[in-house]
Regions:
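A glycine-/small-polar-enriched, mobile loop at the entrance of the PLP active site in fold-type I
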Residues: 18-74, 78
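Active-site phosphate-binding strand-loop segment of PLP-dependent enzymes
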Residues: 129-185, 198
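N-terminal glycine-rich, Lys/His-bearing helix-loop that initiates the first secondary-structure elements
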Residues: 1-38, 395-401
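Conserved PLP-binding catalytic core of the aspartate aminotransferase-like
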Residues: 300-330
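Conserved beta-loop-alpha segment that forms the PLP phosphate-binding cup at the N-terminus of a helix
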Residues: 68-96, 100-108
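Active-site C-terminal subdomain of aminotransferase-like
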Residues: 28, 204-292, 398-401
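PLP-dependent enzyme catalytic core of the Aspartate aminotransferase-like
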Residues: 344-401
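Conserved active-site segment immediately N-terminal to the catalytic lysine
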Residues: 192-204
Length: 401
């Protein structure tokens, strides 16, 4: 018999002090979301039915859509991308994959694995989107599905021309599939107004919920395409017609992630309570404070306005300063974590959900300033703290412990 293992419990010795997550996700969770995640119940029955219906209503507000076709699913935002593509794309599909980084390429790869005829349209996300180049391509070729990312976290760039891109694609009745994993709840996303057909996100970023439970919404046009499809999706768990059984008829599909659904419900409740305009304003205000501090510290921001992503702020260090050393110093000396970026020289600071609270930003700035100074890059930490404090109102600063 193979012997049993005797690992210790993951208690205080493994988590001596909770790390402040200020990277590209996951992000800190509000206490009420943490509490909701401790509850367990049957995934079927009246109580879960009520939770699911409320969750869908609150998700419609987050997506800014009236479509009935809203679903949750087990898995990260990439699983939601799989669900979107797997229900709309097959061997004969013509797919245009618009990409400015890692996650745009990921959807391109997903479509290729479904043996679609894929055209990759790459552009530099730091620059204005080449609408004329897209217009010329759409005049030459017809596509069934267009995939793109609203906020590309790998390059920390925003695509502010998303509404114009969608309008061009809709002229030839292509379905527009959009990754809003980091922008939902942090940046304006208007699914119906922008004519988006499928929009998805993970729970662990702008919504400040737990990883592993995601959201997806299909427009009526996209759902009609799902219903009329002539193929069977290769992934059983992410078949939208099967998922409809649980999310719309309260029938068994697979054992739903009950704790995660409760956590996501609470995260969406908090968003609805705060309202989108106030939440987006809070994110913009906090992110701008972080951006100002990075510039005061003599660091280089990765993207210019208006393509700079507020939700995940990218920056570069002087060439002589090791990004690995900075990440390690922040974590070992201050229990603050920021992110690298897929092997590029970029470092990333998250400004999503609970990351955009005065207490968390002030702790981040203090840790970053002290770490830079310790690594031989002196900074004006007092001035930086004054700068970021000016971004917050007096009431929120009083909450800083």
């Amino acid at each position: 018999m193979i012997p049993a293992n005797t690992f210790p419990a993951l208690g205080n010795s493994f988590f001596p002090q909770e790390t402040l997550l200020m990277g590209a996700g996951p992000v800190p969770q509000p206490p009420s979301v943490k509490q909701a995640n401790t509850h367990i119940a049957s995934h079927l029955g009246q109580r879960m039915n009520e939770v699911v219906e409320q969750l869908k209503a609150m998700a419609r507000y987050a997506f800014q859509t009236t479509t009935p076709w809203v679903f949750g699913l087990s898995g990260p935002g990439s699983a939601a991308a799989e669900m979107a593509i797997g229900n709309l794309v097959h061997r004969r599909s013509r797919v245009l994959a618009i990409s400015s980084g890692h996650f745009g390429l990921r959807m391109c790869e997903m479509a290729r694995r479904h043996q679609a005829k894929v055209v990759l349209f790459e552009f530099d996300g730091r620059e204005a989107f080449p609408l004329d180049r897209l217009r010329a391509l759409l005049e030459q070729q017809v596509f069934d599905v267009v995939t793109l990312v609203h906020g590309e976290t790998s390059s920390t760039t925003l695509n502010p021309d998303l509404p114009k891109i969608a309008a061009l694609c809709k002229k030839q009745r292509a379905l527009v599939v959009v990754d809003t994993v980091c922008t939902l709840g942090t940046t304006e996303v208007l699914m119906d107004n922008w004519q988006l057909d499928v929009v998805f996100c993970g729970g662990q970023k702008g919504l400040s919920s737990i990883p592993g439970v995601s959201l997806i919404a299909f427009s009526n046009e996209a759902w009609e395409r799902v219903v009329q499809r002539t193929f069977t999706p290769t992934q059983w768990c992410y078949d939208a017609l099967l998922a409809k059984g649980f999310w719309h008829h309260h029938r068994y599909h697979y054992t739903a992630p009950v704790n995660g659904i409760f956590a996501l419900h609470e995260a969406l409740r908090l968003l609805n309570e705060e309202t989108l305009p106030l939440r987006i304003q809070r994110h913009r205000q906090s992110s701008q404070g972080v951006q100002k501090v990075l510039l005061q510290f003599g660091l280089t921001l990765a993207a210019p306005l208006p393509t700079r992503l507020d939700a995940v702020v990218g920056f570069q260090l002087p060439v002589w300063l090791s990004s690995v050393a900075l990440i390690d110093h922040l974590l070992s000396q201050h229990q603050v974590e920021i992110s690298a970026s897929f092997g590029s020289p970029l470092l990333r600071i998250g400004q999503m959900g609970e990351q955009c609270r005065a207490a968390n930003v002030l702790r981040l700035v203090t840790a970053l300033g002290e770490s830079l100074d310790a690594l031989g890059h002196p900074v004006d930490l007092v001035g930086a703290l004054k700068t970021v404090s000016a971004q917050y109102g007096h009431r929120e600063l009083l909450q800083y412990d």
